[in-house]
A protein has these predicted regions:
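Mg2+-dependent prenyl diphosphate-binding active-site environment of isoprenoid biosynthetic enzymes
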Residues: 1-164, 170-213, 221-234
Length: 238
């Protein structure tokens, strides 16, 4: 929207990203991963149905995401569609989200290494957030300076989002979060709170939020929706 890009193109790209995001949550909740019973205040898919259904639903969402991006309705330029497909594949695959999930599953081995925890979360959570912003920049034909500013914004928002998630896991309530809390501590998994503590993590969230907003100065009032997104990330309780 900053670049007055076609709303239909943006929404189709956003839907593809959300399909990948939702597939990742379905698989993350499986017994072989985090083994969670609750998601968004409702039973997880494998609890509501069964593991096979959950696995296949996740697979279907993942493949549908790329089917949607490949459709000319997403963008008339085939090179743009290829750019979006490649970007989402990298963000969600072996050098992005999946790599982060592998590190998360080995959480006990990470221990108190802040650099390792940061890298894990930049991949597991941040990669998809980064691509969400990159996709808008691609479709909007942003300049190199604008792409750089947006990439830095997404980096900071992604880390802040995960830090808030870790704070909610440490001191949130199930009625607010819609999912189990205290999981990482119970399982001995490393996160920002287990490494830094709640207050130090909260301070870093504030620093990252302020920094993310500064990256948007280039866009002036056009960046209102992205500024609001920073506030949402910081203030969310779910």
């Amino acid at each position: 929207r900053i670049f007055d890009a076609d709303e239909g193109h943006l929404l189709r790209a956003a839907c593809a990203i959300e399909c990948v995001h939702t597939y990742s949550l379905i698989h993350d909740d499986l017994p072989c991963m985090d083994d969670d019973d609750l998601r968004r205040g409702r039973p997880t898919l494998h609890r509501a149905f069964d593991e096979a259904t959950a696995l296949l639903a996740g697979d279907a969402l993942q493949t549908f995401a790329f089917e949607a991006l490949a459709d000319p309705a997403t963008h008339p330029d085939p090179q743009m569609r290829c750019l979006l497909i490649t970007g989402l594949a990298k963000a969600s695959g072996a050098v992005g989200m999946v790599a982060g999930q592998v590190a998360d599953m080995a959480g006990q081995e990470i221990g108190s290494d802040l650099i390792a925890v940061t890298r894990m979360n930049r991949l597991k959570t941040g990669a998809l957030i980064n691509f969400s912003v990159d996709a808008g920049a691609f479709i909007g034909c942003a300049s190199e300076a604008e792409k750089t500013a947006l990439s830095r914004y997404a980096h900071d928002v992604g880390l802040a989002f995960q830090m808030v998630d870790d704070i909610l896991d440490a001191e949130g309530a199930v009625r607010d979060t819609g999912k189990a809390v205290g999981k990482d501590k119970d399982r001995g998994k490393a996160n920002f709170v287990t490494v830094l503590g709640v207050e130090a993590t909260r301070e870093r969230v504030g620093m990252l939020a302020a920094q993310a907003k500064r990256h948007l100065a280039l866009f002036g009032p056009r960046a209102r929706v992205l500024l609001d997104a920073v506030d949402f990330v910081v203030q969310r309780r779910h």
